[in-house]
Amino acid sequence: MRPLFSHIKKFFCLSLSLLICSACIDEIRLDIDADQAKVAIDGFISDSLRVHSIALSYSSVFGVGNDNIQPPISGANVGIRDGAGNFFSFEESSEEPGVYERLMAGEVGQSYQLEINLPDGREIRSRAIEMPRNNELMGIEYEQIERTFINTAGNVSTTIELILKIDSELDAQKRPFFRWRVGGQYEFHENYPMALSTKWCYISETLDFNQLELLDAREIEGNELRNKRIFSMPLDSRFAWQYCFHIRQFSMSEEEYIYWSNIQEILNTGGSLFDPPPGTVKGNLFNPADENDQILGFFSVASVSYKRYFANPDILNRFVDPKCSAIPFRPQFPECRDCSTVLGSELEKPDYWLP
């Protein structure tokens, strides 16, 4: 998983993952006014031992040049300093220019500050944030709701909505601020008329695109959060064989909660994260030598609790019609002949997959 601010940056510029083109690539001249482009930071550290990354880019100004083109910033010195004075240097990725990486785990109760020296001589810092205590994600449940509507042909149709709900512990001494992310992965079987050889694919997808699910737990009584709805989606052909939800619960600072709440307000007004924001949402990044140098993004310090949840026809107690069929008069789709062409598709079965 990419850093937290990638959840906003990627909303602007990509969906499931970065597509990196290889082979022969013609030079592209980016029509971006350097005087108007701003530095955008995508940074995140958690209490999990993993490769953390900090992504640097120039964010184009909406309405100027080619909107949403974000050229990476290479050659910067990037690192994180903790409250004890230890400095953790990040190295630029050889595969992704402008992305700086390091294997590390943050420590709960310790504070962390991002320090960046850009190639043009500017310094960028974040305000120090203390790593919050991890609040354990205890349980996951689902609910199925039938919804009836009149379709475009004037006929009555019924859809099934699958709702995910979670239970979590709550720190009694210091109430957490939560954000949830939900990803998905499903099993896909090729099938078509007179098929001779077919494959099974395992397809990953981003589910909460353009959605934010937040909670200020100071509003909750007791030491547990119960039946909190965090996500819903239609129960469709993706559940025909098996679906796996990847659920991450982030315990974050109040400052970060306010940041994402401001982003959420933009979405709730009917806008999209692809739309020009009505006003710049201010993060925790700054240039100490120039208060007018606006730095976009937020350096996140958050603890993470993770769980997987499987759903299939047996668990759901419901038959789900597969997308692909060997019956000639049924609709036929290209991926039913070659599912490896689907974005996010892999042929290798995950080792955690249920039999």
Please give the residue ranges for each predicted region.
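N-terminal hydrophobic targeting signals that begin at the initiator methionine
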Residues: 1-2, 25
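C-terminal motif of bacterial Sec signal peptides marking the signal peptidase cleavage site
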Residues: 20-23
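Bacterial N-terminal signal peptides that target proteins for export
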Residues: 2-12
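A sequence/structural signal for flexible, mid-protein segments enriched
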Residues: 25-355
